[in-house]
A protein has these predicted regions:
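Acidic, Ala/Val/Gly-enriched low-complexity intrinsically disordered segments
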Residues: 4-5
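Positively charged n-region of N-terminal signal peptides that target proteins for export
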Residues: 8, 15-18
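Residues at secondary-structure transition points
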Residues: 9-10, 22-23, 109, 167
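Low-complexity, intrinsically disordered segments with a bias for serine/threonine
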Residues: 11-12, 31
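Sec-dependent N-terminal signal peptides
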Residues: 18-27
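OB-fold and OB-like single-stranded nucleic-acid-recognition modules
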Residues: 32-192
Length: 192
């Protein structure tokens, strides 16, 4: 019996706890390399947020709901709506900021392989299909030269890159921000 050390449960308990800790940290760190999420309201000045909260609900059967159509068939923000609905006011501290924002694509241009290289990112699905479109300070023009194959506009995306305050006029809608995307990916179930 001399020289025999009884086996202790301590090392196995320690190893199990260590393994569990590593697994838990590993699952939490899966997205640790990503920037924290930027909320869409961070792109809107406080004064616009207050005006939006005070605005009556839009009746989609009203004359204002018909929007303003351009010669090319695009739908623009209607001037008959409260000013906040076509506000181009921005948040200066967001300029040249690296962000990660979630939203839905409205494709504008594609490459030869059919990948979207230029699109609006909007806060809710079908935003530029429904009338009226979001305010310009709630639309982001995304430039993504690598392109992303989009199966439909109801696919939520994460877009990471440098946000710029930039007024963009387009036949479909106007935007107050543009983003040079470094990474665009589809939101996965594990993100939720």
């Amino acid at each position: 019996m001399l020289g025999v050390v009884p086996s202790s449960p301590l090392p196995s308990i320690f190893m199990r706890r260590l393994l569990l800790t590593i697994l838990l940290l590993g699952s939490g760190l899966a997205h640790a390399g990503e920037l924290p999420e930027t909320d869409w309201l961070e792109l809107m000045p406080k004064s616009d947020q207050k005006a939006l909260e005070a605005m009556p609900e839009i009746d989609h059967n009203s004359p204002e709901a018909n929007g303003t159509f351009t010669k090319k068939g695009g739908m623009k923000q209607s001037k008959g709506l409260p000013a906040v609905m076509y506000s181009t006011k921005t948040v200066p501290s967001m300029n040249d900021k690296n962000i990660r924002i979630g939203g839905y694509p409205v494709p504008l241009e594609s490459d030869a392989q059919g990948r979207s290289t230029l699109f609006f990112l909007v806060p809710y699905p079908g935003a530029c299909i429904h009338v009226p479109p979001p305010p310009p300070n709630q639309l982001v023009l995304v430039r993504y030269p690598k392109g992303l194959k989009l199966n439909d506009i109801y696919t939520p995306l994460w877009v990471t890159g440098t946000l710029k305050i930039e007024k963009v006029n387009n036949d479909l809608a106007d935007a107050a921000y543009a983003l040079d995307a470094a990474k665009v990916r589809v939101v996965k179930e594990s993100d939720l």
